[in-house]
UniProtKB/Swiss-Prot annotation:
<feature type="glycosylation site" description="N-linked (GlcNAc...) asparagine">
    <location>
        <position position="424"/>
    </location>
</feature>
<dbReference type="InterPro" id="IPR019594">
    <property type="entry name" value="Glu/Gly-bd"/>
</dbReference>
<protein>
    <recommendedName>
        <fullName>Glutamate receptor 2.6</fullName>
    </recommendedName>
</protein>
<keyword id="KW-0732">Signal</keyword>
<feature type="transmembrane region" description="Helical">
    <location>
        <begin position="591"/>
        <end position="611"/>
    </location>
</feature>
<keyword id="KW-0675">Receptor</keyword>
<feature type="topological domain" description="Cytoplasmic">
    <location>
        <begin position="643"/>
        <end position="651"/>
    </location>
</feature>
<feature type="signal peptide">
    <location>
        <begin position="1"/>
        <end position="31"/>
    </location>
</feature>
<keyword id="KW-0407">Ion channel</keyword>
<feature type="glycosylation site" description="N-linked (GlcNAc...) asparagine">
    <location>
        <position position="121"/>
    </location>
</feature>
<feature type="compositionally biased region" description="Polar residues">
    <location>
        <begin position="864"/>
        <end position="874"/>
    </location>
</feature>
<feature type="transmembrane region" description="Helical">
    <location>
        <begin position="833"/>
        <end position="853"/>
    </location>
</feature>
<feature type="region of interest" description="Disordered">
    <location>
        <begin position="864"/>
        <end position="913"/>
    </location>
</feature>
<dbReference type="Pfam" id="PF00060">
    <property type="entry name" value="Lig_chan"/>
</dbReference>
<feature type="transmembrane region" description="Helical">
    <location>
        <begin position="652"/>
        <end position="672"/>
    </location>
</feature>
<dbReference type="GO" id="GO:0006816">
    <property type="term" value="P:calcium ion transport"/>
</dbReference>
<dbReference type="Pfam" id="PF10613">
    <property type="entry name" value="Lig_chan-Glu_bd"/>
</dbReference>
């Protein structure tokens, strides 16, 4: 017992010491969890603020449950801003001075933000807002303002892409008259300027406006032609706006309404009646990818709060709380979370305010740096600040219906509008669908795309000025009814304008106003008419108004609808070939010489061929030979060569030569006929410089700008004559300069085309063609009609419509195929017949070569026969192979015909002549009767029939016939 007591007395102090140490460590561990004060300034009575607070509390709870080892814990201090700027400022000041918060989450809108930003900058307390999105706040340039959301300016390119895709040319922004509404306007203007879209009017509506004031503003918009409205305001004012718009009939067919994310992101908190009033509206909404973090949060949210869906602001609030908790934990180990006791302003006078003794947070710079570098994958996408704000790269385009919203497409930076996005593990991929939106239900429950521009029924018509002309009325003609004095406007320019206006994507009422004096005379020049458009007296000018640089400073011209250029018209004269030697003109000198040389060449070749084939030809004298040969050659020109040729080579050559002559003579005949019958119209003046040097008179149209152009080119004013009509222009040409007329006219292509349609055979156009921009329709500077009208003019000029209008007014029933001078008939030269003459030459050479080869072969065959006849022969002749071998049918044993030399009857020839005659005579191959007679006389020659008929054995024709005769 004493031992136990002894041990107990010794161990008790140790147990007590252990227990005391445990309590100390336990207390120390409790003291290591640092409570960090964070303020929240929101409109707590607003639905959106209440939902955002739930998301913030849920974010901090889940974050610290997941990171229970963190040494810091955020303690939220919530203050109500009471929906006023003063209330927000007072709440922030209280949190900084009384609670010494190291950061403030808020405010709830952009109007309350400026004062809080300045307050945070002075106290080094970061102001973190996930709902103040106005770009105006960037101008404060405060490093202590962090925008945990997207800038409103990031959506303007998505809006401009929608406007551009439907080719609307004018829009009217309707925005809240405060910092939030005005902040986006400069960015909208820049975005629309890039796509040439005009902002016709800016409608600012105060959040405090009564329904009557809103209705008055909407009625004002109804009187304007623009039907595309972009609404940028918060849901409270937006709901009232659309309710009144539906009431007065602005949610019907033809209207286009596009809302920014100020309304589109908060449609989940808007009532069903508001959505019903917005049926057919397009919305640009912030897009969050369906990440696993977002889907897990939605599951937990439904379990905790029922079936309510998360909106964008709840997601941003959730990520904002997470980012702030991570940043505070990061700096907690080496930064004091308290406030400095040194005041910013140490003034002790009675004029000081609560701001004068405002202290500053020691953790401010480090916390700001930690927030700038924090990065994690949140429920709203990657949370990573760039220049103090989150960046948006994708927006969702929704079509608002009575039951909610329907996605019709997306907009992605650097890509544009797409129908859908396909999300996979590698990120967002653009679908292969066309860069257009899905079908949209527009206001009025229609699927047809509104034109975007309509003239109201109570709007006045456009006053279009038309010139009063004394001539060239085919372009514009003003006639008046004798009874009513009502003007009737017709002409080429009027038809083009009416056709283009009918094809416009919207209806434009207009009326023509003649630019004339009360007594019906022209009121002034075209420059004066254009200037009155500039002054606003007219809404446009239609007529044969030339587009000029000086006029374009006062008005905007649509694209030209007529041919451009200024040309010079001069008379033409007939210069047909005349004279006794005209028959030589069709062929050039070279071709005449080539043809004559070819005749000589053919004659020589015929001589060579006939000399070898015809014995009679060799017996003729040299003069007869030459005359016969060249008569034969030249007679082929008329195909009158009746004497048959003896040589096959001559016949082939003559056939080829006759073919060449046929082509040559036909071409000669056609050219000569053209020279004698077709007019060769030549201009009296070849070039514009000839007019300047000759000093002749030049005509121009009265009131035309060509007068100044001619003076600039150096022509004397005394030499310039005016005309009003094509007939007067023609009469001046007939007078010529010597009688006070003109020798040339300087005018635009359109007028010249009309003149040439009537007098095309008497005048022509000479070079050069001077530059001019053609006729165009004039409108006031910046008119939205110009781009659309220009597009319709292009459609007209590229199709058959313009041709039909020109045929109606400018060409009529008479068409000039060519307004230039007629070319004289082309003379035939040797280049056109080189191939034919080459063929003749090649064929003749081949025939000559063939003749030489045949002659050499005959000579060799003859030599072989002579040698065979002089050799010893067998006394008994063998019967031919085809003869019967019967003893009673033996062949006669007459000696071979070549072995007998029979003298023909008549005078004897001397030995030399006889030998020469025998060596040169041949059996005519084509005469088969002669050979048959020879065989019948001497049957022993049957076996020699082939030799006789093959032209290879020279025979002595006279000796053979002598033998036949004696037999």
């Amino acid at each position: 017992m004493s031992l136990f007591n002894h041990l107990l007395s010794r161990a008790l102090p140790l147990w007590l010491l252990f227990f005391i140490n445990f309590l100390v460590l336990l207390g120390k561990s409790q003291q290591e969890v640092l409570q960090v004060q964070v303020g929240i300034v929101l409109d707590t009575n607003a639905t959106l603020a209440a939902l955002s607070l739930r998301a913030i509390n849920m974010s901090l709870s889940e974050f610290y449950n997941t990171h229970n080892g963190f040494k810091t814990r955020i303690v939220l201090n919530i203050r109500d801003s009471k929906r006023t700027v003063v209330g927000a400022a007072a709440s922030a000041l209280y949190l900084i001075k009384k609670r010494e918060v190291v950061a403030i989450i808020g405010p709830g809108n952009s109007m309350q933000a400026p004062f809080l930003i300045n307050l945070g900058n002075q106290s080094q307390v970061p102001i973190i807002s996930f709902s103040a999105s106005s770009p105006v706040l960037d101008s404060l340039r405060s490093p202590y303002f962090i925008r945990a959301t997207h800038d409103d300016s990031s959506q303007v390119h998505a809006i401009s892409a929608i406007i551009e895709s439907f080719r609307w040319r004018e829009v009217v922004p309707i925005y809240a008259d405060n910092e939030f509404g005005e902040g986006i306007l400069p960015y909208l203007v820049d975005a629309f300027q890039e796509i040439n879209v005009r902002i016709r009017y800016r409608s600012a509506i105060s959040v405090h406006s009564t329904d009557d004031l809103v209705k008055k503003e909407l009625y004002k918009l109804m009187t304007m032609p623009t039907r595309v409205f972009i609404v940028h305001m918060l849901p409270d004012l937006g709901s009232r706006l659309f309710s009144i718009a539906k009431e007065i009939g602005m949610m019907t067919k033809g209207y286009v309404w596009i809302v920014t994310n100020g309304i589109a992101d908060q449609m989940s908190v808007m009532g069903e009646s508001s959505l019903e009033n917005m049926h057919g509206v397009l919305g640009v909404k912030t897009y969050f990818s369906r990440s696993k973090e977002l889907m897990y949060l939605e599951t937990r949210w439904r379990k905790r709060f029922g079936g309510e869906e998360l909106n964008n602001f709840e997601c941003w609030g959730y990520d904002t709380a997470t980012a702030l908790a991570m940043s505070i934990e990061e700096i907690s180990s080496n930064v004091n979370m308290s406030f400095s006791q040194t005041k910013r302003n140490t003034s002790r006078d009675d004029t000081g305010t609560d701001l004068d003794d405002l202290s500053f947070a020691l953790s401010g710079p480090k916390l700001l740096q930690a927030l700038a570098t924090v990065s994690f994958k949140g429920v709203a996408g990657r949370f990573q600040l760039k220049n103090g704000k989150l960046e948006a790269t994708t927006f969702k385009i929704v079509n608002i219906e009575e039951s909610g919203e329907r996605t019709v497409g997306f907009w992605k930076s650097k890509v544009g509008l797409v129908k859908s996005l396909r999300v996979n593990q590698t990120g967002i991929k653009i679908s292969h669908s066309s860069h257009r939106l899905r079908p949209i239900i527009w206001p009025g429950d229609t699927i047809f795309v509104p034109k975007g521009w309509e003239f109201p029924t109570n709007a006045k018509k456009l006053r279009i000025a038309v010139p009063k002309k004394d001539g060239f009325n085919n372009f514009v003609e003003v006639t008046k009814d004798a009874n009513t004095n009502a003007p009737t406007i017709t002409g080429f320019c009027i038809d083009v304008f009416d056709t283009a206006m009918r094809q416009m994507p919207y209806a434009v009422p207009y009326e023509y106003i003649p630019f004339e004096t009360p007594d019906g005379k022209p009121r002034g020049s075209y420059d004066e008419m254009v200037y009155h458009v500039f002054l606003g007296e007219f809404d446009g000018a239609v007529g044969d108004t030339t587009i000029l640089a000086n006029r374009s400073t006062y008005v905007d011209f649509a694209l030209p609808y007529s041919e451009t250029g200024i040309v010079v018209v001069v008379p033409v004269k007939d210069e047909r070939e005349k004279g006794k030697w005209v028959f030589l003109k069709p062929l050039t000198r070279e071709l005449w010489f080539l043809t004559a040389a070819s005749f000589l060449y053919i004659g020589i070749m015929v001589w060579i061929f006939e000399y070898q084939a015809s014995g009679d030809f060799r017996k003729q004298s040299i003069i007869n030979k030459i005359s016969n040969v060249f008569y034969f050659s030249f007679s082929t020109l008329f195909f009158a060569h009746m004497r048959p040729s003896e040589s096959i080579f001559t016949r082939v050559l003559v056939v080829v030569w006759c073919f060449v002559l046929l082509i040559l003579t036909q071409s000669y005949t056609a050219t000569l006929t053209s020279m004698l019958t077709v007019q060769e119209l030549r201009p009296t003046v070849r070039h514009m410089d000839d007019l300047r040097n000759s000093g002749v008179n030049i005509g121009y149209q009265t009131g035309s700008f060509t007068f100044e152009r001619l003076k600039q080119m150096g022509y004397k004013e005394s030499r310039l004559k005016t005309y009003d009509t094509p007939q007067e222009m023609h009469e001046l040409f007939l007078k010529k300069s010597s009688n006070g007329g003109i020798d040339a006219a300087f005018d635009e292509v359109a007028y010249v085309k009309l003149f040439m349609a009537k007098y095309c055979s008497k005048y022509t156009i000479i070079e050069p063609t001077f530059k001019a921009d053609g006729f165009g329709f004039a409108f006031p500077l910046g008119s939205p009609l110009v781009p659309d009208l220009s597009r319709q003019i292009l459609n007209i000029t590229e199709g058959e419509t313009m041709k039909a209008i020109e045929n109606k007014w400018l060409l009529g029933e008479k068409h000039c195929l060519d307004s230039t001078t007629s070319d004289s008939p082309i003379r035939l030269d040797h280049h056109s017949f080189e191939a034919l003459f080459t063929i003749v030459f090649v064929v003749s050479m081949l025939l000559l070569l063939a003749m030489l080869v045949c002659r050499r072969y005959r000579q060799e065959s003859k030599s072989g026969e002579i040698n065979a006849n002089n050799s010893p022969t067998d006394g008994n002749m063998r019967a031919p192979p085809n003869q019967p071998t019967d003893d009673n049918m033996r062949a006669p044993t007459s000696p071979p015909i070549d072995d007998q030399v029979l003298e023909p009857p008549g005078p004897a020839l001397n030995e030399a002549d006889d030998q020469d005659q025998l060596l040169n005579d041949e059996v005519n191959v084509g005469d088969r009767n002669e050979v048959d007679i020879i065989v019948e006389v001497d049957p022993t020659l049957v076996h020699r029939r082939n030799l006789i008929t093959s032209k290879t054995i020279p025979t002595r024709r006279a000796a053979l016939f002598s033998r036949i005769k004696s037999a």
